[in-house]
Regions:
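Substrate-binding cleft of carbohydrate-active enzyme catalytic domains
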Residues: 1-127, 131
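A glycine-rich phosphate-binding loop feature that marks nucleotide/adenosyl-phosphate handling sites
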Residues: 65-66, 103-107, 137-142, 244-248
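Active-site beta-loop-alpha junctions enriched in small/polar residues
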Residues: 8-10, 61-65, 107-109, 136-138, ...
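Short catalytic/ligand-gating loop segments at beta-alpha or beta-beta junctions
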Residues: 133-138, 181-183
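Short glycine/threonine-rich loop-to-helix capping motif typified by GTGT followed
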Residues: 111-119, 144-153
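Flexible, acidic glycine-rich loops studded with aromatic residues
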Residues: 144-146, 152-280
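Short low-complexity, flexible loop/linker segments enriched in glycine and/or proline
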Residues: 17-22, 71-78, 141-150, 177-182
Length: 342
């Protein structure tokens, strides 16, 4: 089990720094000023994770997603001054986190200093840590990085470098009921089991939008049920296709795939009532929810038009010389078009 902790962003630097307290100053924080994790809290969480056999992976995103750093120091991370400061921060971070890995980001940024990433990887390794980096991001050859983390459909595992698959696993893009089906069905990186090149998967909860209560992240994004769905694949392997294949559609009731999901749902609801009792577990049974979905009728931009299904429900419709079918769908969340495609 893994907990990936993204500690720094454009909006704020959320990990306390004793050597550079200005990083946590409210004047350098543009969202939820004054809120950050102390070094003592970070150490306590490391101990908690160890007791529960959870690997904690802290992330200090560099050189992108670093506007908070720039506000505090008036230096870009890739500048000579920025690199000196960052190494001092890495000393503090590596001392605080008694864990084997450190994630250094490297995504969504223009590289202006070709020495920045190799030098930072070497520096973190000199502290006894293995290094993880986003892909797409800096391009590595085998031996130049310890693991990559795929964050986009463009992300590709490289032979000789273990990869973590998070390409389509963004909870903030999910419907609570629809996408759990895709997570459960999905092969990790379209592989039935792990290998030296495919290390596993991580479920991403990016709270890009401002919220008034942190617990709403858990509720609105269906964290716990989706976490169990992806754990089913991470622990057991299998799956029927990749996330963007069958997608969020529950298979027909008479198929083995449907029966397997129904069994998983039953087990998940047991955990809701027992393991997660008292926690916001946003899921109810959906394998008994059935819909009839009619092909789309063109309204030509006229929102007041009335169509045959509004007068009478049928299995097929003939309208203006065209035939419109009806198909059954099962589940509490139905997409007409998904964020990842049709």
């Amino acid at each position: 089990n893994v907990f990936h902790w993204h500690l720094t962003e454009n909006q704020a630097w959320r990990l306390e720094s004793k050597i550079f307290p200005m990083l946590n100053d409210s004047v350098n924080t543009i969202r939820m000023p004054g809120k950050y994790y102390t070094l003592e809290e970070a150490r306590d969480l490391v101990d908690f994770c160890k007791k529960h056999q959870v690997l904690l992976i802290p992330e200090i995103d560099m050189p992108g997603h670093s506007a908070a750093f720039v506000r505090a120091f008036r230096h870009d991370m890739q500048s000579p001054e920025g690199m000196k400061i960052l190494k001092l921060l890495l000393d503090e971070v590596c001392e605080t986190f008694d864990v084997p890995y450190l994630h250094i980001g490297t995504d969504e940024v223009e590289f202006t200093n070709p020495h920045f990433v190799p030098e930072m990887v070497a520096y973190v390794r000199s502290k006894g840590k293995k290094v993880i980096s986003w892909n797409p991001g800096w391009h590595y050859k085998p031996g130049e990085i310890d693991m990559t983390h795929l964050w986009s459909y463009r992300g590709k595992a490289q032979p000789g470098i273990p990869a973590i698959d998070s390409k389509f696993h963004y909870l903030n893009h999910f419907d609570v009921f629809g996408d759990i089906v895709a997570l459960y069905n999905s092969r990790i990186y379209d592989q039935a089991e792990g290998s030296e090149d495919i290390a596993g998967t991580i479920l991403a909860l990016w709270h890009d939008r401002l919220i008034d209560n942190e617990w709403n992240l858990v509720i609105e994004n269906g964290l716990y049920p989706n976490m169990l769905a992806i754990a089913e694949r991470a622990w057991r392997g299998g799956g029927t296709e990749y996330f963007d294949g069958l997608g969020t559609i529950l298979p027909p009731e008479d198929t083995e795939a449907f029966k397997e999901f129904a069994d998983f749902e039953k087990r998940m609801l047991w955990h809701k009532e027992h393991t997660f009792k008292g926690y916001p577990f946003a899921y109810v049974k959906q394998t008994n929810v059935k819909w009839n979905i009619t092909d789309a009728f063109p309204n030509g931009g006229d929102m007041d038009k009335v169509f045959p299904p509004e007068q009478e429900l049928k299995d097929i419709y003939h309208y203006n010389g065209n035939t419109y079918g009806v198909r059954q769908a099962i589940g509490a969340g139905i997409y007409l078009r998904h964020v990842w495609g049709d």
